[in-house]
Regions:
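Beta-strand segments within the central parallel beta-sheet cores of soluble alpha/beta enzyme folds
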Residues: 2-6, 43-63, 152-157
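Cofactor-binding beta-sheet edge motifs in enzyme active sites
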Residues: 9-18, 22-26, 63-69, 157-161, ...
Length: 190
């Protein structure tokens, strides 16, 4: 497997994989994995896990706020996620996410004065068009639960959904260039 992957990367010869393309390199790698698994009679997941099997599960991310158009609010970012990256195991990660999600409902109620609505992806509907306000509300819910040092944020910006031909990327009531959107997103991390 490693030899095939290395060969594909060397054939491409570019740091960003633009000659063969990441999709082609990935597809060949997966095909090699599938062929190797089939030759041993193992399901793909068992073959990839190796002789010792899977001993850990990645800590998941949890969608807590949904963007889109809800209740007259146009939140451009698609999803706001909580990542309990310091959870000791999957059970604790789920427990943290559930508590934060429930508390976020209370925080949204305090912010808006109304019961929060559930969005199409089963997170709460974003109560503000401003992503910074949404992140602040999530941070408040995390702090209220005592998990400030155990959680991080993630965003599904879905920038293709924000793009309006000839205008740019719609965010916070105005249109941004791609450079401005990147600078804005970078600013959210600081």
């Amino acid at each position: 497997q490693t030899a095939i992957d290395r060969c594909m990367i060397e054939l491409d010869g570019t740091p960003d994989k633009h000659v063969l393309g990441g999709n082609a390199i990935y597809s060949v790698s997966v095909a090699a994995y599938r062929a190797a698994a089939a030759s041993t009679g193992l399901p793909l997941y068992d073959y990839i896990a190796g002789p010792g099997g899977v001993r850990t599960v990645p800590i998941p991310s949890f969608n807590v706020l949904n963007g889109g158009n809800n209740n007259g609010i146009r939140q451009a970012f698609n999803e706001f996620l909580v990542m309990p990256y310091r959870a000791s195991d999957i059970e604790q990660a789920v427990e943290i996410a559930v508590k934060v999600f429930q508390e976020l409902g209370n925080v949204i109620r305090e912010y808006t004065g109304a019961a929060p609505m559930v969005g199409g992806s089963y997170g709460w509907c974003a109560p503000s068009e401003d992503p910074e306000v949404c992140l602040d509300l999530i941070a408040r819910a995390i702090a209220n639960c005592g998990y400030t040092n155990q959680c991080a944020f993630a965003l599904d910006c879905a920038s293709s959904e924000m793009y309006e031909a000839g205008k740019g990327y719609y965010l916070n009531g105005r249109h941004l260039t791609s450079r401005e959107l990147i600078a804005y997103a970078k600013g959210l991390t600081e």
